Amino acid sequence: VIARVIAAAGDDGKLERARELGADEVINYTNENIGDAARALTGGRGVDACLEMIGGDILIQSVDALASGARMASIGAHGGEKIELDFVEFFRKHISVHGCGRSTKAQVERVLALMAEGKLKPVIHKTFGLDEAAAAHEVMESRNFFGRMVLTR
């Protein structure tokens, strides 16, 4: 086994989709604390790597889920929330958290090449015309989607 994938989401429908896409375990963060649940799923150890995409309290819970020596990449905090983190945990557990923003041109080219080779398949919730941009934004604000929304001409 190369990796055991644990996915977290706020509703069971999204968790079911995550299982369909290959998640081995799922955590509903509406009902469970991510750190507690991740440790329960890993025999108390925590996770070695985490991709966090929401920010706020979910980021804090994700840091709590990390094992000693783990790494986390965060592309969350889109709402601009300010949070408090206990940096003693970072030192004690030797963890690192990387903030991720825009992709570089080289990264985009690599992703496009993987897609062209059929090795990476994007999950698309819905495609909208440019004249439907407001409707696409409403769907995003509702958080009632799984995958990406695509705008086309």
Where are these regions (language model features)?
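Glycine-rich phosphate-binding loop and adjacent beta-alpha segment
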Residues: 12, 53-123, 153
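Adenosine-nucleotide cofactor-binding segment
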Residues: 1-61
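CheY-like receiver
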Residues: 37, 41, 65, 114, ...
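Generic structural signal for individual residues within well-ordered alpha-helical segments
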Residues: 16, 35, 91, 109, ...
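Short, hinge-like loop/turn segments at secondary-structure boundaries
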Residues: 23-27, 45, 89-92, 114-117, ...
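Residue-level recognition of specific faces of alpha-helices
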Residues: 17, 71-74, 148
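A conserved short coil-to-beta-strand element within the FAD-binding core of flavoproteins
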Residues: 129
